[in-house]
Amino acid sequence: MDLCAKEAWQELEQQSELKAKIAQDNWRLYFHLMPETGWMNDPNGLCQFNGVYHFYHQYVPQNPAGKEAPHWGHKTSTNLVDFKEEAIFLSPEHSYDRNGVFSGSAIVKDDQIHFFYTGNVKNEGDHDYTFSGREQNTVHVISDGYSIEKQEVVIPHEAYPAGFTDHIRDPKVFEKEGRYYMIIPLVICGNVPISFNLTDKIFYFFHHRE
């Protein structure tokens, strides 16, 4: 669903009717987080910034089975009990994430939130999408939690080490002793920890195979 389709979906009368119907459902969850409509999956980019807790998650608003390219949904809270539904934060609207804004994480640095996520691309052709046909790009987003200041690919698919499947996704970022690190899980072959500098974006690959 591209940006125009996303905006149209949010404004559709049937979307409002569906929200109202779901809100009255006897099986709707209230203690645990649940989207207003559609499909919800992995929590992403959990962080606290300027007194607000931000909870992002995999989200397909128009399909409860999740059989569409996922976005990042967004909820906020000041007490971790009451949550407010926010506008969709990230959508698959670029060439590097056109088949899904996959999972990632966030870290606060220099009064900004830095998000890292996997942009999923499935190329046309006779592929199994495990060993061929899939691109997984690591994307960096700078934001205040609501609007996007900058968004760019920092590790394109072709920059990953050779010898792994095309399933290279869901970067986890963290800080230790003044240095910032990223862990990217891989299918079958274990993990490749990548240390990085948010300022100059120089990457160092350390291969760890099981």
Predicted regions and their residues:
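Beta-rich carbohydrate-recognition and catalytic domains
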Residues: M1-E210
